[in-house]
Amino acid sequence: GFVYWHYWFGNGKRLLERPFNEVLASEQPNFPFALAWANETWSGSFHGLKEGNVLIEQTYPGDDDYIAHFNTVLPAFKDHRYITCEEKPVFFVYRPFELPDTKHFIELWRSLAIKNGLSDIYFVAIIGSLHTDDRANEMYNRAKNLGFDGVNVVNAYDAPITDLKYRLIRKVFFKNLKCIPDIRPYRADMFDSCLDGRMDVIPTVMPNWDHTPRTGKRGILLYGSTPVK
């Protein structure tokens, strides 16, 4: 299936919703899909901005907004193409710990789902920055305690940190070249996690990675992945 990023910044503020709306309305392509709520403020270099600059702020106005948000995605949940787990529509949350009341949000949406003829919702927390096994287990347990059914492990932004040899080479030979992005060879173990064997964990497979179109010289680029790796 295909997971579409879904933007809801609070008070009904949305962006980039047209492509998915057309998929929903046209019933094409006839291909399984799910939604992932990219609930974060657009700011800093990760979003192609100077540090400290904010383009769009993510807000959480409260229950009325949560209900409006649910009603907006309900037609997608009821679409026959929508990906389900245990007969529940799967919904990803990009920043699961940034909601001021994550557990309440999940409980509210579960009740709304049942009231609207769904069996429930299968909530998946997207987690990263898992530099150690202890950190990975801490984040996993935190997500589960908030009510998430599953966890998606994404270490894409942490991957270069693990390559000590490459960091040393860059520091010694390229310390004055601040005008080039962070270019490093791909290694499969960059994305391994001690959580990957759990039944409620969705590992991430990433065929290369290039964030430079958005972040330019401050971006990260991984190259050289193959099906074998």
Residue ranges of predicted features:
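Glycan-processing catalytic domains of CAZymes
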Residues: G1-K229
